[in-house]
């Protein structure tokens, strides 16, 4: 399968490396940043410089590929999806942006190839797992989806380090959040709904953030009383972000906030990804609660040290692409994450990264 990876940043680099290591994919990376491309070229991965904001140039560049994987920031998603449609290639992305996903859904109408956005951790894997749990109940009361990408060793006041896109992080803190309450789909405010819980002896907080549940509200509408998604952080983080975004009004000056965070909040590869899902409802005439949890830590994959967010985000994208290649997913139109079987995902060679396995055994290149 010939795959164009558009975006050679951290996650795009990881996706390209993982796919190449299987020996089943012919991968070419595209970006406008020559320095980022040079890093991939040094690993023997073919690259091509192209301006991803130029839809015509991108469309011409990806002609003849089977699939396009978009690993660029959310605000470029619609442009790249349009290029994929023009080139007649299948489209996959990682976007958490609700408006971008809605636009991509319109692009996918009447398309004879597949458009599958939101293929990362959240949205992505979290929706696959939550949908599987929900389907085990005859009557669903509550679905609670909690995900955190956290530093393993928090040391600053925010108790946070940068582990993924600053643009995506700020966007999910600022945009309205979809939820179901009292069996009705509605929009709730980001940073609200603060709650606290503990897992394995560690205290956490969680609060509303945008985009993490993908299309699950629509899929479960009419079947569930309450459904929501919240980001997990260490206690105290939400209050400080609320001060920055609301009291200092940086929600309306995102460029300044991005500069502050990039200058002052260090990145880390020593991170942990927490997935925590609870579903309650009726089964066999009894009120039952079922919990799904995973903790994924940074480790070496394909002989390369990788952070937990690299493993989970790139691993999810590669697993979904692999299942699509095996024709276990629809081959045309708009494809939702919850159309992926959790069993198939976790049995997949890339999905097994969520179970602590490695790809080293299948590397052939």
Where are these regions (language model features)?
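C-terminal catalytic/substrate-binding lobe primarily of soluble NAD(P)-dependent oxidoreductases
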Residues: 136-365
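Conserved N-terminal Rossmann-fold NAD(P)-binding element of oxidoreductases
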Residues: 3-7
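Conserved Rossmann-fold cofactor-binding substructure of NAD(P)-dependent oxidoreductases
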Residues: 51-64
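N-terminal Rossmann-like NAD(P) cofactor-binding module of classical short-chain dehydrogenase/reductase
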Residues: 62, 66-70, 91-93
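Helix N-cap at the beta1-alpha1 junction of Rossmann-like dinucleotide-binding domains, i.e.
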Residues: 33-36, 98
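Rossmann-fold NAD(P)-binding glycine/threonine-rich loop
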Residues: 94-117
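Beta-loop-alpha module in the N-terminal Rossmann-like domain of NAD(P)-dependent dehydrogenases
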Residues: 67-84, 97-101
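N-terminal Rossmann-fold NAD(P) dinucleotide-binding loop
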Residues: 12-13
